[in-house]
Amino acid sequence: MKCPKCNSTHSRVVDSRHADEANAIRRRRECENCGTRFTTFEHIEMSPLIVVKKDGTREQFLREKILNGLVRSCEKRPVGYQQLEDITNKVEWRLRDEGQAEVSSREIGKHVMNLLMHVDQVSYVRFASVYKEFKDVDQLLESMQGILQEKNKRSDN
């Protein structure tokens, strides 16, 4: 690593710690030339994931888009931000575990809805109303009946 002060490439690691929920390593370094201390981060490099949208266009996967959609769906609901981060992480890892270079936006939405249903049903309906593009109240009611049936199945077991 180059020293930010003198550009020397000779430094020693003074301290190492996990960062970003163990997805990165934070290293405290000291330049052997000038003594300046600086911090570096080491992250896992992920292969790019491409999202194929409904209209056929392609764009790079951005986890922030999932998180922003979840935040909007969960406004004024008893859902913590960490829960939304967890859902986003699970969705991203599931997509990456599938090993595909491209994934449809529809597939992403299904993963999000499956996880969100078990966290908060009102937020699920809000998310589904945008994702499924309900045309009328009947479609919304159908979705809600599906939630009730799922809930009844779980309570029977």
Swiss-Prot record:
Keywords, alphabetical: ATP-binding, DNA-binding, Metal-binding, Nucleotide-binding, Repressor, Transcription, Transcription regulation, Zinc, Zinc-finger
Q: Where are the zinc fingers (unnamed)?
A: 3-34
Please provide the Gene Ontology terms (biological process) for this protein: negative regulation of DNA-templated transcription
Residue ranges of every copy of the ATP-cone domain listed in the record: 49-139
Necessary cofactors: Zn(2+)
The record's comment on cofactor binding reads: Binds 1 zinc ion.
| NCBIfam families reported in the protein's UniProt record | transcriptional regulator NrdR
Primary role = Negatively regulates transcription of bacterial ribonucleotide reductase nrd genes and operons by binding to NrdR-boxes.
Provide the family line.
Answer: Belongs to the NrdR family.
Name under which the protein is recorded = Transcriptional repressor NrdR
Its source organism is Staphylococcus carnosus (strain TM300)
Could you tell me the gene encoding this protein?
nrdR
